[in-house]
Amino acid sequence: MGQKVNPKGLRVGVIKDWDSRWFADKKDFGDYLVEDHKIRELIKKESFSAGISSVSIERASNKIKVTINTAKPGMVIGRQGAGVEELKNKLEKLTGKKLIINVEEIKFQDLDAQLVAENIASQLERRISFRRAMKQTMQRSMRAGALGIKTMVSGRLGGADMARSEGYSEGTIPLQTLRAAIDYGFAEADTTYGKLGVKVWLYKGEMLPGMTEEDLPVYKNKKNDKNKKRRNNNRKGKSQAAKN
């Protein structure tokens, strides 16, 4: 049987960039790798409800630049920047190095596989039926402009004695096409029957050479829709003013 490889790892260096961008000697490589893992774990733990999708880490001499991609930047930053300052102090204490933290907002949450997976997991923890949780979330992503989505939930579904996996898919998911921009997310739900694993594959279109993720048709259509709404609102405002 053919096993499924992580779609992000398969596309690194082709259409995706690394989440950790630094170079190290043999003696330092292991330490840096463990440090990156600890940084990500601490950020996830401290800002669990902020909807963090990914954390990018860059290193230069004795400085670390951390970029947090989140759906709720206000929760990470806190009032007058108190939250991000507290997080920075904790990370500096953990690493013993100077840190720069950037917080970037994810504008389209339904088009981020990690956030979609975490959304399904949170619904499962609230005892919502796994079929309903998957189908509703998939419909939202397809309405948001995704070209295809596949979800899978594994574990003791519905409290059954034997663990099993159940999944649904909609649209197209070309996993073997390396230029296909497929986002992958994984989350765990802690239920009274044990842990349930949630996997999400989300297809956003083909990424051709020289393109960035923002150039994908999914995001371009979203921007065009926003501009259309703005123009329509301006026209309505002008026509009402003319009538008055």
From Swiss-Prot:
InterPro entries xrefs: KH_dom (IPR004087), KH_dom-like_a/b (IPR015946), KH_dom_type_2 (IPR004044), KH_sf_prok-type (IPR009019), Ribosomal_S3_C_sf (IPR036419), Ribosomal_uS3_bac-typ (IPR005704), Ribosomal_uS3_C (IPR001351), Ribosomal_uS3_CS (IPR018280)
Start and end residues of each KH type-2 domain: 39-107
Bias (Basic residues) ranges: 220-238
Highest taxon above the source species: Bacteria
Region Disordered: start-end pairs: 216-244
Any one GO biological process: translation
Keyword terms: Ribonucleoprotein, Ribosomal protein, RNA-binding, rRNA-binding
SUPFAM superfamilies: Prokaryotic type KH domain (KH-domain type II), Ribosomal protein S3 C-terminal domain
Pfam families the record matches: KH_2, Ribosomal_S3_C
GO cellular component: cytosolic small ribosomal subunit
GO MF annotation, one: rRNA binding
HAMAP family: Ribosomal_uS3_B
Family membership noted in the UniProt record: Belongs to the universal ribosomal protein uS3 family.
Complex formation: Part of the 30S ribosomal subunit. Forms a tight complex with proteins S10 and S14.
General function of this protein: Binds the lower part of the 30S subunit head. Binds mRNA in the 70S ribosome, positioning it for translation.
PANTHER family in the cross-refs: 30S/40S RIBOSOMAL PROTEIN S3 (PTHR11760), SMALL RIBOSOMAL SUBUNIT PROTEIN US3C (PTHR11760:SF19)
Protein name in UniProt: Small ribosomal subunit protein uS3
Biological source species: Finegoldia magna (strain ATCC 29328 / DSM 20472 / WAL 2508)
Lineage, highest ranks first: Bacteria, Bacillati, Bacillota, Tissierellia, Tissierellales
